[in-house]
Design a protein with these regions (language model features):
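Donor nucleotide-activated moiety binding/catalytic core segment of transferases
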Residues: 195-231
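Active-site donor-nucleotide binding/catalytic segment of nucleotide-sugar enzymes
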Residues: 11-13, 129-188
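Leloir-type glycosyltransferase catalytic cores
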Residues: 181, 260-304
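Catalytic donor nucleotide-activated moiety binding site of glycosyltransferases and closely related
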Residues: 175-209
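Extreme N-terminal starter segment of soluble prokaryotic enzymes
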Residues: 5-11
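Conserved donor-binding/catalytic loop of nucleotide-activated donor transferases
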Residues: 218-220, 238-242
């Protein structure tokens, strides 16, 4: 017999991947801000055990923790556990990103627009992946961020082109001090040949912790992000910064480049080639906070 579910309890399944945790924790935190909840983080079950639970076995699972109003997760390894948890203890099963299982199995699927989700009652389209960043009221016009990614499935790389773009950005406004950081994908030789410049501090990813970037985004009035690092583009937008896109070669027109092109057309970001050198990047007029928008929809739909 299922225990009575409470909207005050959220189970968050984590596969341990930073990008997935950023999304699921972002939604859980947003729910907590709107309506205080207890967030319980759980490891996903092995697939065989999750399937057994779905078929009515594993009756002792999760009996020692409060029943959830919501179970949520991001990443393929969490999908069966979401369904098993709902089967065993109740609650609404919410999956972030397009699942590998049929969409109809979940109460709600939060899927980025660039994944072209179908129009269904249990599908909410998001602008990019959700994240933990909060809109900031402490942005400083004299602080800028340069966020460097690396080669990916959709983009190749060109150090020299990036060096030229970075030099132009630094030279354009002597009132801004820039902080540059890298990612796990950044080629090792990128920093080796990056020219030193006044008003530029370089902090490699190896010298940062999980809270470093959110702290920087809370203060930076401008952020330039390489096109491959689309998740950081959305994080910078959520913080409220004026966002520019550093251009790297695309392997082909793809869903990521199409998503960035759409953001530029809507005035949220500026590509380097479209940036007038004598002007500062403009901040978007609206608020970009997809985690809160989705959390508000969930509460109004099920827990109002």
């Amino acid at each position: 017999v299922k225990s009575r579910a409470s909207p005050r309890v959220v189970w968050r399944f984590s596969d341990g991947k930073a990008g997935h945790d950023n999304q699921s924790q972002g939604l859980a935190d947003a729910l907590n801000r709107l309506r205080p909840v207890e967030i319980i983080t759980l490891d996903p079950l092995p697939a065989v055990m999750a399937l057994s639970a779905l078929w009515g076995g594993q009756r002792a699972l999760w009996r020692n923790i409060p029943a959830p109003g919501i179970v949520l997760g991001a990443g393929h390894r969490t999908h069966l556990s979401l369904l098993a948890a709902r089967r065993m203890r109740g609650g609404k099963a919410i999956v972030l990103m397009r699942p590998s299982l049929p969409l109809c199995l979940f109460d709600l699927c939060l899927i980025p627009a660039h994944d072209a989700p179908p129009a269904r009652p249990n599908v909410q389209v998001t602008r990019g992946a959700l994240n933990r960043i909060q809109p900031s009221s402490h942005l400083e016009p004299g602080r800028g961020l340069l966020l460097i990614g690396g080669p990916s499935a959709h983009f190749t790389w060109d150090n020299l082109s990036l060096y030229r773009q970075i030099a132009a950005i630094i030279a354009a406004d002597p009132a801004i001090h820039w902080t540059l950081t890298t990612s796990r994908r950044t080629p090792q030789n990128f920093l080796q040949h990056l020219a030193c410049a006044e008003r530029l501090t370089v902090i490699p990813i190896t010298e940062t912790g999980p809270d470093w970037l959110p702290a920087q985004l809370a203060r930076a009035g401008q952020a330039w992000v390489t096109a491959d690092s689309v998740s950081m583009v959305y994080e910078a937008l959520t913080a409220g910064a004026a966002v520019g896109v550093l251009e790297v070669p695309s392997r082909r027109m793809n869903r990521v480049t199409q998503g960035l092109t759409r953001l530029a057309a809507e005035g949220w970001v500026t590509f380097f080639t479209d940036w007038p050198r004598d002007c500062r990047l403009h901040r978007p007029s609206g608020i970009f906070n997809e985690a809160e928008r989705c959390a508000r929809w969930i509460i109004e739909r099920w827990f109002a």
